[in-house]
Amino acid sequence: ESYMAATVALSGGGGWPMTVFLTPEQKPLCAGTYFPPEDGHGRPGFGTLIERIAELWENERDDLFAQAEQLTEQVKKQSKLGRACGIGAESIAAAVDQLESAFDPRWGGFGAAPKFPPSAALELLLRHHHRSGEARALEMVTKTLDGMKNGGLYDHLAGGFARYSTDERWLAPHFEKMLYDNALLARVYTWASQVTNRDEYSRVARETLDYVLREMQSAEGGYYSATDADSEGEEGKFFVWTPEQIRQVLTEAEARAFSAAYDVTPGGNWEGHSILNTPRPLAEVASELETSEADLRERLASAKSKLLAARLKRVPPLLDDKVV
């Protein structure tokens, strides 16, 4: 628990895997969650990180020890404060203030990349808004929910969310899907739809639960814990598209509409391929295509159904069949 608290303090978020570098006295020097094998998407690879820490250990060891000591004391103080104070209105207000200080006003979420879906924080903010009427709390919720559902973190064909985003704008996910994330996010989007009366939130909640029931439920009625990020040895291969792949499945009109709405381009937005996302309002896309929103929605619904059927013919990611 102490190392996870240190990870949250240093990186703005926690999760598994957890990566912590320690002093010989087992005090944390550096902490984070997943680091890729190689540098990419604005993030250092694990090898780069090790080399940097080794360099600091050789040249700035005293500063590292001081940082480790300071962080250890901070974690101890927070632990004691939590046990002594319990949770009351003052604690909740302090938590909301802390979330606001870490909030990303452009893309939503809290802290820097990698960004994990902050389900518990969003539930806290929704409850706080319900009790206090504080508009800022709801603004943080809606900005974050919009960013996640519009980005590549969300599976726009099958529903459900990936485990986290490797970038600040929720575009490039680590494509693994976890049962617990999707259960929590379905609840948050449901509550948000009740508070805001926004149909798109209830749609995302339904699609997420449909995904869980369709792809993660065992024959005996339990639920599998996760699906992998990789298929055929490549991360994300099951999920990404090229314009040519789109045209092979759809009519010309459907392909044009879908590519415009879901950001499918010749150059791609991720390693030469396109991660599906919706960066523009549907009304803007409809205007560009000189059609009505109703007609565009009809084309997109047909296109998504065809593309999902085509995707199901690909080699799927491995299923972690531990049952919850």
What are these regions (language model features)?
Residues 1-324:
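Replace the tail clause
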